[in-house]
Amino acid sequence: MVSEYLKQNTAEYHDAAEKLFNSEKIFSKTFTVEDYKKIIHTNYLMLLHSEDKIFSSLADKFGEKLQLKQRAKLPLIEKDLASLALENRTADSHILEFENEHEALGAMYVIEGSTLGGNVIAKQLSKTEGFDEVTFNFFGCYQENTGPMWKNFKEVLDTEVAEENYQEVLSGAKKLYTFLLNVN
């Protein structure tokens, strides 16, 4: 299954992202609003430069199966930016392109995977001092539907991607992780 293949082959990228965002501080309750601003801003840049490209690559074949309209996160993270008084800016020096729908699915794997962790982050930070006024639009995007949305995504991915396309899917995931890790 391609979802397992991606999990195994992107683990080092996932770990690097956790390190970049000081994720260990979330559970020790030492994560600050400044740390949160960094994670939101970086994820905003990732979504700004990828979401439309991913969706346009997938729209015809996967639009309904993946419920793409319900998966749009850019408007949600823009609300978080506004509530944190952060600027909407671009990362023009970083180009992000996906060659085909398989790469787009790989990139989407990174974004959808972040919603699983994001849900945990939102719950944890809502109990952390200093986060009383923070809205979690992006990290809480699916709320109680996080599990079912992830399950749907994985099922479509595992059903629709043939083994000969695993490398292309992995390539898309690595492209997006590389962008995320280097955009700031």
Question: Language-model features: where?
Answer:
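Metal- and O2-centered redox machinery and metal/ROS homeostasis
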Residues: 1-184
